[in-house]
Regions:
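N-terminal secretory signal peptides
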Residues: 1-9, 20-23, 29, 33
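Intrinsically disordered, low-complexity N-terminal segments that are enriched in acidic
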Residues: 15, 32-128
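A mature extracytoplasmic/lumenal domain signature
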Residues: 68-70, 120-122, 135, 238-240, ...
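Short loop/turn segments at secondary-structure transitions that flank enzyme active sites
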Residues: 70, 124-128, 191, 242, ...
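Short intrinsically disordered coil segments
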Residues: 80-83, 132-140, 281-284, 339
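Acidic low-complexity segments
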Residues: 94-95, 115-192, 196-210
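Active-site neighborhood of thiol-dependent amide/isopeptide-bond enzymes
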Residues: 170, 174-178, 183-265, 272, ...
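Active-site rim recognition segments
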Residues: 244, 248-372
């Protein structure tokens, strides 16, 4: 059949449409390849963080504990705390083992609902490690020993030790062991959105059941536990995200007007030639699970690669640390110890309030950046 001019036109239109589709796809590929996540230290930011707790039931005497930033390091300066409310007494207290500070308020039984508002001012900055340069790091031997010990939820023997040995097989230096544990965590664990709060951090149960889904308290807790099991000092740092990420990652920032649920724990390890080094494999899993519409299961994805690279040795300073305490016994409390302290806590004669139940335990957290 002869080709008509109309046929030629239709063919050209098809070719032009195909070219347009190909051209339209290029920016998306380039955009994915150009995603950047590279926090670098050097600029300090100042934040004012306000936590307000209101207890609806005023019929019993009530006790309230609000975590206070207790960290002073090369990445955070905890400056000052002020508070208001109708407590019969309020004061700053600390747990006896780790020194985690908190505002403690006592409220008498009465008709007025207990209210306590805490305002904390901090300065933060990004963290990053120059892996091409070693430093003359020193730390007290007793301090390092402390950060290799087990906790109630973080044993370092049995299945935890066996898993750590398997994950570090063939690695001889502390840095190589930490790298292999980090990679093992990223490849074996995953973010599970249905887990309440930041998770429990029961790492033995995770390994025994083979259920590696969790949140930061579980995943970074497992990372820390595996490091400790092979003799590498490591610790969780419990805190809260304050503002959006400067790199456009939605899941790696917080809404400063409403920070309930923005609590997040990170981790540190002690490397002989580096000192204390930042780590956050849990946030790699969070990006893989939640940053895009579909669950990313390949850590080589262009959205994931820069995050995985940067969070081995660094983190973004849009986050405030509270403390690094485990097995926290709240001063003056009648209830059980907490695995960690990131959320406001309260109790009355009926027991401990559920900090994740907004209907009965109402609190708000907000942040404001103070610009010079």
């Amino acid at each position: 059949m002869p080709i008509t001019p109309q046929d030629r036109l239709s063919r050209r239109q098809v070719l032009m449409a195909s070219a347009a589709l190909a051209a339209g796809a290029l920016p998306r590929v380039a955009c994915a390849q150009e995603r950047r996540f590279d926090p670098q230290p050097g600029v300090w930011r100042t934040f004012e963080v306000t936590t307000r707790v209101e207890i609806k039931d005023a019929s019993d005497a009530t006790r309230v504990w609000l975590p206070i930033p207790s960290i002073d390091t090369d990445y955070q300066k905890s400056l000052e705390n002020t508070w208001t409310g109708n407590a019969s007494s309020a004061r700053i207290v600390a747990d006896s083992k780790y020194g985690a500070k908190m505002l403690y308020g006592e409220f008498d039984a009465g008709a007025t609902p207990p209210v306590l508002t805490l305002t904390s001012r901090v300065q933060t900055q990004n963290r990053a490690t120059d892996w091409q340069r070693t430093v003359g790091a020193t730390e007290d031997a007793a301090t390092l020993k402390r950060w290799t010990r087990p906790t109630d939820l973080m044993p370092t023997d049995g299945i935890v030790l066996d898993t750590a040995r398997e994950a570090t097989r063939g690695a001889w230096s502390d840095e190589a062991k930490v790298r292999q544990i980090y990679d093992w965590i990223v490849s074996h664990t995953y973010r599970e959105p249905e887990v309440r709060g930041c998770g429990v951090g029961d790492i033995k149960t995770m390994l025994e059941t083979g259920n590696f889904g969790g949140k930061c308290g579980d995943i970074n807790g497992l990372f820390v536990g595996l490091c400790r099991a092979v003799g590498i000092p490591a610790r969780d740092i419990y805190g809260i995200r304050l503002v959006p990420s400067a790199f456009g990652y939605r899941e790696l920032g917080g809404n400063p007007a409403k920070l309930q649920g923005a609590q997040h724990c990170r981790a540190e390890v002690w490397l002989k030639q580096r000192g204390w080094v930042a780590m956050d494999p849990a946030d790699v899993g969070k990006v893989m699970r939640l940053e895009s519409a579909e669950w990313i299961k390949d850590e080589r994805n262009p959205l994931v690669v820069p995050v995985k690279r940067a969070l081995f040795g660094g983190w973004e300073g849009n986050w405030m640390a509270f403390n690094n305490a485990h097995d926290v016994k709240l001063p003056e409390a009648r209830g059980a110890k907490l695995g960690f302290l990131m959320y406001p806590q309260a109790e009355n004669a009926n027991g401990r309030y559920d900090a994740l139940d907004p209907d009965n335990f109402k609190y708000t957290i907000s942040a404001r950046e103070i610009l010079a």
